[in-house]
Amino acid sequence: MPKMKTKKAAAKRFKATGTGKLKRGKAFRSHILTKKSTKTKRNLRKGGYVSETQEKTMKTLLPYL
């Protein structure tokens, strides 16, 4: 059976932690920032984690991560 391919678009956006969770960046921070409050922009700087409901999908996209 051939090797499974990693989806490179996903590999660039997610990093695995030591416990196996997936870290991700937050969306809505690239442009149209004038109407967003300072507090909102500050909170968007922090990373997030992939939810448990999405982890199974992510494992198929990133089989070797």
UniProtKB/Swiss-Prot annotation:
NCBIfam families xref list: rpmI_bact
Gene Ontology BP term (one): translation
The keyword Ribonucleoprotein appears for this protein: yes
Alphabetically ordered keywords of this record: Ribonucleoprotein, Ribosomal protein
Entry's Gene Ontology molecular function annotations: structural constituent of ribosome
Signal peptide (UniProt feature, chain positions): none
Pfam families assigned to the protein according to its UniProt record, in alphabetical order: Ribosomal_L35p
Disulfide bonds: none
One GO CC term, this protein: cytosolic large ribosomal subunit
Domain of life: Bacteria
Protein name: Large ribosomal subunit protein bL35
Family, as annotated: Belongs to the bacterial ribosomal protein bL35 family.
SUPFAM superfamilies named among the record's database cross-references: L35p-like (SSF143034)
PANTHER family named among the record's database cross-references: 54S RIBOSOMAL PROTEIN BL35M, LARGE RIBOSOMAL SUBUNIT PROTEIN BL35M
